[in-house]
């Protein structure tokens, strides 16, 4: 399994007062940015159906999200983020099992692995940082991203990054606490931008993922 940080996240539907609530909680606005994300998969959706998500972000490079911790229920996800191109390529060859792997960057192996663009869209993001009161100074802050995609969809995400599986429950507890402070209903589940994009523009692919998820074959919705 590829190594990387474990991302623990929960998506929610932001309201008109979300930024005001963040300010009241003492969150600080880190930056506002605009970027393009492009996602790749095979025509059979081999990656997404196995809960792997390959993305190229403009200005940031490649990332492969792989399934993380299992067995923790609720409206949240845990993924291992792999950003080293060598590690991504190794994982892609392991997943897709196509021929002999040679040293190369991700872009160079797209063709041989039959990976093609399945989605591309622009996001405007405001990124906030928040440390819960009483937290130790060395504890990582939570990140709250508020995204607006160019196809008319907005979604928020509360995120924590941890190094070990043992840290996931504590991170999840913080995420649930902050979500509650922001007025997010306990069981609210907001879909990722990619899933909404596929639903609108590639409905057949979206339906395949939906059917696989309902049958327990996949656990989609990681794409941020």
UniProtKB/Swiss-Prot annotation:
Disulfide feature:
none
Query: Mainly localized where?
Result: cytoplasm
Q: Name one GO molecular function term.
A: thiamine triphosphate phosphatase activity
Residues carrying N-acetylalanine: 2
InterPro entries in alphabetical order? CYTH-like_dom_sf, CYTH_domain, THTPA, ThTPase_euk
Q: Any idea which positions bind Mg(2+)?
A: 7, 9, 145, 157, 159
Which GO BP terms, alphabetically? thiamine diphosphate biosynthetic process; thiamine diphosphate metabolic process; thiamine metabolic process
Q: Which family does it belong to?
A: Belongs to the ThTPase family.
Q: What does this protein do?
A: Hydrolase highly specific for thiamine triphosphate (ThTP).
Name of the protein in its database record:
Thiamine-triphosphatase
Q: Where does this protein come from, organism-wise? A: Mus musculus
What is the taxonomic lineage of the source species?
A: Eukaryota, Metazoa, Chordata, Craniata, Vertebrata
